[in-house]
Amino acid sequence: MSPDEISTRCATIEECYEFMLAYAGQGLTGDEGSHASGEVREFLRRAAQALLGLAEVYAAAVKSRNLQPAEPYLAYLAVLEKDAGASLAAIQLVLAQNPISSQLIDNLNASIHLRALLTDLFLVDEIMKPQRTQASGAITA
């Protein structure tokens, strides 16, 4: 696991969400014949891939960086795992639809599961930033 894998996964999921906001605003009834149609599926696929094993990557980062006290970090692992799993299920459900309309994406954007996940990611990414900075400083010093 690279030191920035959590950050990379967070960015992939956030980029998908931002693209979905734009896609939802287009008022498309389906995803055929639109340049955005292939893109929305690709963004969703990448987000789904980033979600796979996300909690395990977080746990490995806590362990490899010896974050102390470990208990609060590991307790949050259950929250992240639940929210990532629910979001992945929702994304996979949308990917199974043909076509993917703007309204469907708007409903996915409004999903409490996806919103909870995004909040989790913002929190985890922000907490890990000082850890990345300290790790980088230790390597270059």
Language model regions located:
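Core of compact, soluble alpha-helical bundle domains
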Residues: 1-64, 139
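A generic "alpha-helical surface" signal
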Residues: 4, 11, 45, 78, ...
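Alpha-helical transition-metal enzyme core signature, strongest for iron centers
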Residues: 13, 47, 51, 84, ...
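Amphipathic protein-protein interaction modules
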Residues: 59-109
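Amphipathic alpha-helical binding modules
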Residues: 87-140
